[in-house]
Swiss-Prot record:
Keywords: Glycoprotein, Glycosyltransferase, Golgi apparatus, Lipid metabolism, Membrane, Signal-anchor, Transferase, Transmembrane, Transmembrane helix. Residues 30-376 are lumenal. One of its GO terms (cellular component) is Golgi cisterna membrane. Catalyzes the transfer of L-fucose, from a guanosine diphosphate-beta-L-fucose, to the terminal galactose residue of glycoconjugates through an alpha(1,2) linkage leading to H antigen synthesis that is an intermediate substrate in the synthesis of ABO blood group antigens. H antigen is essential for maturation of the glomerular layer of the main olfactory bulb, in cell migration and early cell-cell contacts during tumor associated angiogenesis. Preferentially fucosylates soluble lactose and to a lesser extent fucosylates glycolipids gangliosides GA1 and GM1a. The gene is Fut1. CDD domains: Fut1_Fut2_like (cd11301). This is Galactoside alpha-(1,2)-fucosyltransferase 1. Its main location: Golgi. Pathway: Protein modification; protein glycosylation. PANTHER family: GALACTOSIDE 2-L-FUCOSYLTRANSFERASE, GALACTOSIDE ALPHA-(1,2)-FUCOSYLTRANSFERASE 1. The chain crosses the membrane at residues 13-29. GO terms for molecular function: alpha-(1,2)-fucosyltransferase activity; fucosyltransferase activity; galactoside 2-alpha-L-fucosyltransferase activity.
Length: 376
């Protein structure tokens, strides 16, 4: 009777181990082992000497309530890796996050955010997208795509497995079909929500101390827009007359409303917003570096008045209810209209109140600015 030698037994055992390991990696990688080197790259650090690595390694963030993001992504059937270059401030990066999530899902890709975006958004929201390791980012063979600020058919058929998006997308046309998921991603941390609700619950209207029935968040965008809008884009920001009309719109439709004003130009608000009704409170701190408090206040209101900017858009989008926005805030020949489409920026059910462009029209009227031509 034949009896295998010790050497033959060892070789047989080794073969079984190799086959088992190969089967494990094959199934773990969704049957796409050779096209996607994720598992092999993680297990073999020197693999990048042979092939550009595509492993996505999470940063070692602690998984606690303040971080918002899980320390590593769950296994999924999605392939490839997409990310987006963070840019701008809080509202801009919210738009970039939501657009990345929506486009990656639409094209069957995995989405990862940059550490800078995590630093901006995670202190405020319970975001779930994992973070891309900087070293992996630097070694990945990215394709690049600059997005414009509205959804296009071409964005539904993007075939690049390793794609780095850029631009400042913040249009509901990218992600509105995922509204409930977006709202979950932008869920406030408990302490921010509770602080906002505590402040709102203590507000009263007028000397009689009437308890408000409706809370209207008001975001007045000023700051750098005071220079950028007229000088670069031939546009205006929300003025006193616009805010008065917007508040009157709500007063005509809701009993006992209270207006909760936040702004990065609170001094102007104090001097220009009519408080004679006793229904206006200046509640925000206007700190652009720590926007969580102001944003939480706005989203916990029932309705929104916004002027311009992505911060106000997101406050209105997450608060729900009625939204009044500043419409037609640039001259018709503004370069801004080449990168901004109002129908893609404001939801159809939102209510627009036209801006007063007369100061701009006088500024750019050749009869007013060219005295020689006027005399001729």
């Amino acid at each position: 009777m034949w009896t295998p030698s010790r050497k033959q037994l060892c070789l047989a055992f080794l073969s079984v181990c190799v086959l088992s390991a190969g089967s494990f990696f094959f199934h773990l990688n969704g049957g796409n082992f050779f096209q996607n080197a994720l598992t092999f790259s993680v297990l073999c650090p020197d693999y990048h000497l042979l092939k550009s690595p595509v492993a996505m390694v999470c940063l070692p963030y602690p998984s606690n309530a303040s971080s918002g993001s899980p320390s590593c992504p769950e296994q999924s059937l999605l392939s490839g890796t997409w990310t987006i270059t963070p840019g701008g401030r809080f509202g801009n990066q919210m738009g970039q996050y939501a657009t990345l999530l929506a486009l990656a899902q639409l094209n069957g890709r995995r989405a990862f955010i940059q550490p800078e975006m995590h630093t901006t958004l995670a202190p405020v929201f319970r975001i779930s997208l994992p973070v891309l390791d900087p070293e992996v980012d630097s070694l990945t063979p990215w394709q690049h795509l600059v997005l414009h600020d509205w959804m296009s058919e071409e964005y539904s058929h993007l075939e690049d497995p390793f794609l780095k998006l850029s631009g400042f997308p913040c249009s509901w046309t990218f992600f509105h079909h995922l509204r409930e998921q977006i709202r979950r991603e932008f869920t406030l941390h408990d302490h921010l929500r509770e602080d906002a609700q505590r402040l709102l619950s203590g507000l009263r209207i007028g000397p009689a101390g009437i308890r408000p029935r409706t809370y209207v968040g008001v975001h007045v965008r000023r700051g750098d827009y005071l220079e950028v809008m007229p000088n670069r884009w031939k546009g205006v920001v929300g003025d006193r007359a616009y805010l008065q009309k917007a508040m009157d719109w709500f007063r005509a439709r809701h009993k006992d409303p209270i207006f909760v004003v936040t702004s990065n130009g609170m001094r102007w608000c104090l001097e220009n917003i009519d408080t004679s009704h006793g229904d206006v409170v200046f509640a925000g701190n206007g700190q652009e570096g720590t926007p969580g408090k102001d944003f939480a206040l706005l989203t916990q209101c029932n309705h929104t008045i916004m002027t311009i900017g992505t911060f106000g858009f997101w406050a209105a989008y997450l608060a729900g209810g009625d939204t009044v926005y500043l419409a037609n805030f640039t001259l018709p020949d503004s370069e801004f209209l080449k990168i901004f489409r109002p129908k893609a920026a404001f939801l159809p059910e939102w209510v627009g109140i036209n801006a007063d462009l007369s100061p701009l029209q006088a500024q750019f009227d050749p009869w007013e600015t060219d005295s020689l031509f006027r005399l001729a």
